[in-house]
């Protein structure tokens, strides 16, 4: 009887809440409609729901996520409505979604002060990442950006010695895979990209890498931190997956939580806090000096920002935000670049021929510099086209901090302004915008780097956001990706995709990563011939870049001067 009464009470509470939400939503909608008429705004198309409060919208989003088709489903929603801006409802909240360049420019620039990142992202990220540059608003955001921006100058990106060290670790890993015919018959490049970028990112941030690549080599001996390095990398990945699922619930992100997620957060915090305490006690430089010698003094991001603030929680938060940007965006972008190139042997050869001409062969390379990488047009086109088709942040959102408007999307023709009430969310999808055929042509879904020849773009192309919160580290991300691409194409004369699935999966955590992996078959070239000697091939593939001028990486056994690092998400 008690169980029956309790169940009845629960049903009554749930039913009452749903009725309250429906009535409240109706009253608010009427109030917003009156305000919209006052501002001479018209309604955009509305995505109809089958269930109350748009519960079916949440279920559809979760199903698309599970099927690894979330960005594809967003495109279909726009196509079904035949609009570039529409209103939708999810768990009672009525939001706007747009893929209109003019609206996105308004949100990110023209009316920047009308929109915040908002409480949803901040509340979602807080348990793991804290409140840093990607979640803060107002004065807190200005403070974070002021601390971080000076750390990403051209001096930091132009020295590529650190990157060569981690590229050589990659080459040591793939060396044993080379067969007697000079081919690596099967390799998934994606996990190698993630290991490379987390190693280089953590070395830049903390002064030493987590050595996620080296731990796979025979005879590797870990540092005093031991398994904590590996546990950190695993926890950082699993924690991001939880954050991504929470984000599907939007304002109700708190509905998704677990002990496993909280445990991941603790592991991540404990690892970073170790380095923060070293920096605050002035012990970080001494620790790094014990493991690195020779050359100029190593730049350490944590040490630099610790000179600006001594708040340990703030330091940890900013480190984790930059790590998210510096590791995941670059690795994901590299995955999409090689996904595209491996499926297009003609363009792979075209890019490789240009790289050999401008940067030399793997055995006889010329100098690879920041300036030369930026000046390599076709390499830039390949990066731009991959970011157009597969932007690392395919959808983003802002919250209105006051009643405001967007210039387009309302009325029958979609050209009237629309009303954005205070507290509502406006999503903007660059993934959809980057594939609009009315902007990019009928071949918008095709990988075609040549389309960038002579093309000037504005707000229709936003791989790194725009306005005051534009990504301050986009050059770092592009230079690192370009450097790794050059070295791999110098090494592999051919690359064939082994993924025959026409459906491309999207593993959308906080970053859009290819779910299929980058499974390829690749051949190693040596002086234009394929060697038949395994040992010779493995020696060649592990050969470090020794450049001809003063700023050259030293052989692998030497200690390298270090400085610089990637990053990638908009702040």
UniProtKB/Swiss-Prot annotation:
SUPFAM superfamilies, A to Z: Cytochrome P450
Entry-linked InterPro entries: Cyt_P450 (IPR001128), Cyt_P450_CS (IPR017972), Cyt_P450_E_CYP52_ascomycetes (IPR002974), Cyt_P450_E_CYP52_fungi (IPR047146), Cyt_P450_E_grp-II (IPR002402), Cyt_P450_sf (IPR036396)
Record-annotated membrane-spanning stretches: 8-28
E.C. number(s) listed in UniProt: 1.-.-.-
GO molecular function: heme binding; iron ion binding; oxidoreductase activity, acting on paired donors, with incorporation or reduction of molecular oxygen, reduced flavin or flavoprotein as one donor, and incorporation of one atom of oxygen
UniProt-annotated stretches for the region Disordered: 552-571
Cofactor field: heme
Gene3D superfamilies the UniProt entry points to: Cytochrome P450
Changes seen on gene knockout: Impairs the ability to produce 1233A and its hydrolysis product 1233B.
Pathway the protein acts in: Mycotoxin biosynthesis
An example Gene Ontology CC term for this record: membrane
Upregulation: Expression is increased upon exposure to hygromycin B.
Entry's localization field: Membrane
Alphabetized UniProt keyword annotations: Heme, Iron, Membrane, Metal-binding, Monooxygenase, Oxidoreductase, Transmembrane, Transmembrane helix
Signal peptide extent: none
Pfam families: p450 (PF00067)
Binding sites annotated in the UniProt record for heme: 471
PANTHER family linked to this entry: P450, PUTATIVE (EUROFUNG)-RELATED
Function according to Swiss-Prot or TrEMBL: Cytochrome P450 monooxygenase; part of the gene cluster that mediates the biosynthesis of 1233A, a natural compound known as an inhibitor of HMG-CoA synthase in the mevalonate pathway and with antibacterial and antifungal activities. The highly reducing polyketide synthase g433 is responsible for the 1233A backbone biosynthesis and the cytochrome P450 monooxygenase g430 catalyzes oxidation of the backbone.
The family this protein is said to belong to: Belongs to the cytochrome P450 family.
Name under which the protein is recorded: Cytochrome P450 monooxygenase g430
High-level lineage: Eukaryota, Fungi, Dikarya, Ascomycota, Pezizomycotina
GN (gene name): g430
């Amino acid at each position: 009887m008690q169980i029956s009464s309790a169940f009845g009470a629960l049903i009554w509470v749930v039913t009452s809440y749903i009725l309250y939400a429906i009535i409240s939503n109706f009253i608010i909608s009427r109030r917003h409609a009156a305000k919209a008429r006052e501002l001479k705004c018209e309604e955009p198309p509305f995505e109809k729901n089958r269930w109350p409060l748009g519960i079916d919208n949440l279920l559809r989003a979760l199903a698309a996520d599970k099927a690894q088709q979330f960005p594809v489903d967003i495109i279909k929603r726009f196509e079904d409505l035949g609009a570039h801006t529409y209103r939708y409802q999810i768990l009672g909240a009525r939001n706007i979604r747009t893929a209109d360049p003019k609206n996105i420019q308004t949100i990110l620039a023209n009316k920047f002060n009308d929109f915040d990142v908002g409480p949803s992202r901040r509340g979602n990220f807080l348990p793991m990442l804290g409140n840093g540059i990607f979640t803060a608003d107002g004065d807190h955001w200005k403070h974070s950006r002021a601390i971080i921006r000076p750390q990403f100058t051209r001096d930091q990106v132009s020295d590529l010695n650190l990157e060569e060290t981690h590229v050589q670790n990659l080459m040591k890993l793939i060396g044993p895979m080379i067969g007697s015919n000079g081919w690596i018959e099967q390799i998934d490049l994606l996990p190698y990209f993630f290991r490379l970028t987390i190693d280089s990112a953590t070395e830049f941030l903390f002064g030493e890498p987590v050595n996620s690549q080296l731990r796979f080599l025979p005879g590797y001996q870990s540092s005093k931190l031991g398994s904590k390095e590996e546990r950190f990398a695993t926890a950082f990945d699993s924690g991001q997956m939880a954050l991504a699922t929470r984000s599907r619930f939007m304002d109700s992100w708190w509905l998704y939580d677990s002990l496993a997620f909280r445990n991941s957060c603790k592991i991540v915090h404990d690892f970073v806090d170790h380095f923060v305490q070293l920096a605050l006690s002035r012990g970080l430089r001494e620790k790094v000096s014990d493991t690195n010698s020779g050359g100029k003094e190593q730049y350490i991001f944590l040490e630099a920002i610790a000179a600006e603030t001594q708040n340990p929680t703030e330091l940890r938060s900013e480190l984790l935000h930059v790590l998210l940007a510096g590791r995941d965006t670059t690795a994901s972008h590299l995955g999409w670049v090689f996904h595209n190139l491996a499926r297009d042997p003609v363009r792979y050869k075209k890019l490789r021929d240009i790289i050999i001409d401008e940067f030399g062969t793997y055995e006889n390379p010329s100098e690879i510099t920041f300036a030369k990488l930026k000046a390599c047009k076709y390499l830039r086109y390949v990066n731009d086209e991959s970011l157009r088709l597969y932007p690392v942040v395919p959808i983003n959102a802002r919250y209105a901090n006051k009643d405001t408007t967007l210039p387009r999307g309302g009325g029958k023709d979609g050209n009237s302004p629309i009303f954005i009430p205070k507290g509502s969310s406006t999503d903007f999808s660059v993934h959809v915008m980057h594939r609009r055929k009315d902007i990019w042509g009928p071949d918008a879904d095709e990988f075609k780097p040549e389309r960038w020849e002579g093309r000037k773009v504005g707000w229709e192309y936003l791989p790194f956001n725009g306005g005051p919160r534009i990504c301050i580290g986009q050059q770092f991300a592009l230079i690192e990706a370009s450097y790794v691409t050059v070295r791999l194409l110098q090494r592999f004369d051919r690359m064939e995709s082994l993924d025959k699935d026409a459906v491309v999966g999207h593993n959308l955590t906080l970053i859009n990563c290819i779910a299929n992996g980058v499974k390829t078959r690749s051949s190693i070239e040596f002086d234009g011939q394929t060697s038949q000697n395994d040992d010779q091939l493995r020696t060649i593939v592990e050969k470090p870049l020794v450049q001809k001028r003063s700023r050259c990486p030293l052989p692998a056994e030497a200690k390298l001067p270090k400085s610089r690092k990637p990053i990638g998400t908009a702040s």
